[in-house]
């Protein structure tokens, strides 16, 4: 009798109707089940895809850009500048004019003489550009460059003489002490 009461107690809330909670999967009332744990996430916002191109109202006005102004230093320090050559193109006076240079109406600094460009400090926070006349220093006759140039000159002379049929004797080949 105790078994029948326990079975009746177990099936007490069940019915076989189509609207019963048993057929829908609700076992909580009939069978004691461990409590369900659920984790809730925040609602997802709609996915927005951004691209490199701006689209929208007035998109025909997008995609325009002006060409660069070609500003900056044109002749660097210790390089040769001819008269009238542009040294720096700038907006404003980032560089101030020094000796032998002029300042154009668009703040372009240009050379007035033929010489070397020098960038100098002008106060604590300014820079000055000057052009100094180039002093030509005499070349060392024993330098590598001069010896190489002389060697190639002798080779050209020998080659030219061979073509003409005359063989030149170099100054090293003739000896006046033994003969």
From Swiss-Prot:
Keywords: Chloroplast, Plastid, Ribonucleoprotein, Ribosomal protein, Transit peptide
Keyword Heme among UniProt keywords: no
Transit sequence range: 1-51
One GO BP: translation
UniProt-annotated location(s): Plastid, Chloroplast
Signal sequence, renumbered to the chain: none
Gene Ontology MF: a single term: structural constituent of ribosome
Pfam families: Ribosomal_L27
InterPro entries: Ribosomal_bL27, Ribosomal_bL27_CS
A cellular-component GO term for this protein: ribonucleoprotein complex
Family: Belongs to the bacterial ribosomal protein bL27 family.
Subunit structure: Part of the 50S ribosomal subunit.
Protein name: Large ribosomal subunit protein bL27c
């Amino acid at each position: 009798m105790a078994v029948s009461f326990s079975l009746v107690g177990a099936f007490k809330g069940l019915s076989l109707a189509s609207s019963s909670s048993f057929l829908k999967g609700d076992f909580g009332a009939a069978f004691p089940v461990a409590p369900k744990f659920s984790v809730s996430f925040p609602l997802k916002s709609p996915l927005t895809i951004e691209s490199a191109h701006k689209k929208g109202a007035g998109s025909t006005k997008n995609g325009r850009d002006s060409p660069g102004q070609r500003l900056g230093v044109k002749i660097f320090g210790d390089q040769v500048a001819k008269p009238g050559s542009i040294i720096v193109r700038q907006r404003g006076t980032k560089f101030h004019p020094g000796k032998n240079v002029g300042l154009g109406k668009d703040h372009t600094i240009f050379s007035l003489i033929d010489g070397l460009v020098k960038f100098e400090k002008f106060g604590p926070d300014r820079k000055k550009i000057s052009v100094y006349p180039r002093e030509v220093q005499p070349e060392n006759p024993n330098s590598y460059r001069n010896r190489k140039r002389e060697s190639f000159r002798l080779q050209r002379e020998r080659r030219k003489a061979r073509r003409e049929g005359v063989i030149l004797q170099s100054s090293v080949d003739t000896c006046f002490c033994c003969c």
